[in-house]
Amino acid sequence: MRILGLSAALLILGGCASTNEPPVQANDPSFAPVVPDYPRETVVEDGSLFRSQLANNLYSDVTARRVGDIITVTLSENTQASKSADTSTAKDTNVNLNPITGLAGQAINIGGESIQLGVSSSRDFSGDAAANQSNSLIGAISVTVVDVLPNSNLVIRGEKWLTLNQGDEYIRLTGIIRPADISPENEIVSTKVANARIQYSGTGSFARAQEKGWLTKFFDSTWWPL
């Protein structure tokens, strides 16, 4: 009996085991701004304000195009999804065996009753499901260019943290953009970011209040038989 109780306890603990990723922390080195690695100048001209690595043509724009440049991403995400399914099946089966007859064509009786058999079965199934989901994210975040691909596309990455009185709110964004999609104001819409990874969440007591307890997680896990 003790072994059975111990096994049940282990199953409960296994079902309650959390598989969540470690909590997000601020100042993650992976999202730190990238400092461009400019080559050292062989000749240093004292008193000169001109820096060749930062020089722009008279007709060039100021949009991001190099590693370390900053670009503003306008968040405009709005997705809606719905799905429904309805399934219904039915099956009826009937098998009848007429009375068994003898050589003379007369029914064989046992105890005054003829031998005959009848079997019937009926099976019905019906099920329906519906799911609706919508998401909306509006805002802006400034990110930096971390890499320039051979085809001139830009890899961007950045984060924004807002410290509130009951925790922190953060936005993280990574993706690939085309220089042609950047506006003259050095902005781009998030819908034009390829391979975008946009994360908006929070930490602290307010975020923890929305998490399920360990017992609720057990009842929602696959270990719960019902």
Curated annotation (Swiss-Prot):
Entry annotated with the keyword Cytoplasm: no
Family indicated by similarity: Belongs to the FlgH family.
Subunit (UniProt): The basal body constitutes a major portion of the flagellar organelle and consists of four rings (L,P,S, and M) mounted on a central rod.
Stored NCBIfam families: PRK00249.1-4, PRK12698.1
Localization (cell): Cell outer membrane; Bacterial flagellum basal body
Role of this protein: Assembles around the rod to form the L-ring and probably protects the motor/basal body from shearing forces during rotation.
HAMAP family: FlgH (MF_00415)
Lipid moiety-binding region (N-palmitoyl cysteine): C16
Pfam families named in the record: FlgH (PF02107)
One GO location term (cellular component): bacterial-type flagellum basal body, distal rod, L ring
Record-given protein name: Flagellar L-ring protein
GO biological process, any: bacterial-type flagellum-dependent cell motility
Main location as per UniProt: membrane
Membrane protein topology class: Lipid-anchor
GO molecular function, one term: cytoskeletal motor activity
Disulphide bridges, residue numbers: none
Signal peptide: 1-15
Organism: Alteromonas mediterranea (strain DSM 17117 / CIP 110805 / LMG 28347 / Deep ecotype)
Keywords tagged on the record: Bacterial flagellum, Cell outer membrane, Lipoprotein, Membrane, Palmitate, Signal
